Amino acid sequence: MAQEQKQPRKSSEADEAVEAVAETDVSERKEALDSDVDDILDEIDDVLETNAEDFVKSFIQKGGE
C-alpha cells in the first residue's frame, strides 16, 4: 500500500519574490565577473603591446621542461 506524503506548497507570490531576488543576485554577479574579465584582458593587451616576444617566450618549453 503506497503512502502519500503531503508537502506544504509556497504561495506563488513568495516564489516570484525569491526568483526576482535570485535573478538580481545573478545579474550583479555577472556584471562583476564581466568587469573582472575585461580588466584581465586589458592587462594582457598592455603586456602584448609592450613586450609580446618575451610574453610568448615565457610559455615556450625548453629542452624537456
Swiss-Prot record:
Select a single GO molecular function from the record's annotations and give it: protein tag activity
**Biased composition range(s): Basic and acidic residues:** 1-13
Instruction: Provide the residue span(s) of the region labelled ARC ATPase binding.
Output: 21-59
Q: Is-annotated flag, keyword Acyltransferase?
A: no
Q: Which InterPro entries match?
A: Ubiquitin-like_Pup
Q: Where is this cross-link: Isoglutamyl lysine isopeptide (Glu-Lys) (interchain with K-? in acceptor proteins)?
A: 65
Q: Which UniProt keywords apply?
A: Coiled coil, Isopeptide bond, Ubl conjugation pathway
- GO BP, one annotated term: protein pupylation
What segment(s) does the record annotate as region Disordered? Answer: 1-34
In what pathway does it function? Protein degradation; proteasomal Pup-dependent pathway
**Coiled-coil region list:** 25-49
Query: What interactions and quaternary structure are annotated?
Result: Strongly interacts with the proteasome-associated ATPase ARC through a hydrophobic interface; the interacting region of Pup lies in its C-terminal half. There is one Pup binding site per ARC hexamer ring.
List the HAMAP family: Pup
Cited function: Protein modifier that is covalently attached to lysine residues of substrate proteins, thereby targeting them for proteasomal degradation. The tagging system is termed pupylation.
The UniProt comment on domains reads:
The N-terminal unstructured half of Pup provides a signal required to initiate unfolding and degradation by the proteasome but is not needed for pupylation, while the C-terminal helical half of Pup interacts with ARC to target proteins to the proteasome.
Instruction: Give the family this protein belongs to, as stated in its UniProt record.
Output: Belongs to the prokaryotic ubiquitin-like protein family.
Q: What is this protein called?
A: Prokaryotic ubiquitin-like protein Pup
Q: Which organism is the protein's source?
A: Nocardioides sp. (strain ATCC BAA-499 / JS614)
